Amino acid sequence: RDLAEELRIKNLVEPYFNEYALSQTVFVLKNNEEMLYQLVSGGLRRLGEFMTIYTTENFRNLKVVSSPAVSVGISLKSDLLELKIHSDEMSREELAYLLSKYDRKKKYIRLKNGDFLNIEEDGLSTLAEVSEDLRLTETNLKKGTLIVPKYRAMYLDAALKNNQLLSIEKNKEFKGMVRNMKTIEDSDYEVPEALNSIMRSYQKNGFLWLKTLRENGFGGILADDMGLGKTLQVISLLTAEQQEMQAGEKELRRSLIVCPASLVYNWQKEITRFAPQLKTVIVAGSVPDRASIIRHSKEGEILITSYDLLKRDAEVYQKFVFAIQVIDEAQYIKNPSTQAAKGVKKITAAFKLALTGTPIENRLSELWSIFDYLMPGFLYTYQKFREEIELPIAVNQDANKMERLQRMIRPFILRRLKGDVLKDLPEKIEENVFARLDGEQMQLYDAYATRMKEMLSQQNEKEFHKGRMQILSELTKLRQLCCDPGLLLEDYHGESAKTDMCMELIVNAVGAGHKILLFSQFTSM
């Protein structure tokens, strides 16, 4: 016996079998489909180079077959996509079965007759991923013609692009919309004339992006770095919308801006500054006052309110259909279970936009909540999203899942950093942010201001000059009350408009990776 040769042959055979009967010197392959596939797909051929192999008829009938040629038709009809999946080599039922059984971790699919279908490097794997991402069930696939939301168009175009093993047919409406989304800078939309000389090049591109989303019926996230002028880009869109409504090209409707309370009046000032022809309405005051303001607002006006007030007034807003709804500092709805998040999602609007200065792709639960506001269902239910996308990415660092998620969301997020647009920026960007006193802080300021006026009214000229230091002291107290009443009153625990706004700016800046240098005449703040 040639023991060395026997050992060599044994080592060649062993990888294809999972049991070895020592007493009978027999290898056994038992209950292991993966090893059976390896044996049938290439193992027998390799072993046959060294030995004579005898098989039963049943075993000889096991085959490894190639994937069928599949054609995919995509049509845009109104606001829906029609998807047709077809193969001349098998029935719809068989094709649906294959797609439902696809597992990207495997190299094959076991057919009902026992044969193996090779799915390595073929169009079927791409189609199966699309089927999974679109949540197409085997029952859906058996129909042959599928209806999916229009917002899947860019994903489908990217997922099926350049796949030589799939035959893709697209109707002209679908190709036209995709072309518009991909060539935004070449679009025919025009920046409003009054703003054209004010806006920087990247801001004009931002307007074109917003306008393209608006006209195609998609929502979006404008996530430019802090200081790059997201507000001005939104104002340009609101201006264009108003011009089209006045020209009769669009139905006359209100728009709605929702932001932190500290930014409500800042939004009004910025709109008045850049587009004074736009009519803004602040929704504030008591519950009856706010309801009256909303109900008596006119079509074409821009309502501005805070997250806190909107969640209380959501029922009143639900009676209207808005042209544009903007949520500023969109991280306010990062927790979908909060009343603020539920409130903004109850509003009906033709176009929904979210603004944020911080990157959101790495905070997946926040990303889901924002897209649930923009285009409900786009990222499925949160339970499905968490199980199938968030946890695999966060826990297992699943690169394939991350790439597929990016492919879905990429067309609907625009983020430019300062480093990306340096040539368009001045040496220094200055921005004035206005804080409006309210509530207890305003009452304290009014009380101290009234007391000072009474004191001054009772002084003659001589007393006035003699008491100048006291007057300066009283003026300092008023300034302290404006900054934060806690500077003057140790037991004050109420709100401070300027401190609250300052903290929001700091939190957002730090969240975007910026460093902060803070100056104040009252360092005890």
Predicted regions, residues:
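Charged, low-complexity
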Residues: 2-16, 21-220, 247, 251, ...
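ASCE P-loop NTPase motor core, strongest for the SF2 helicase catalytic module
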Residues: 165-398, 404-525
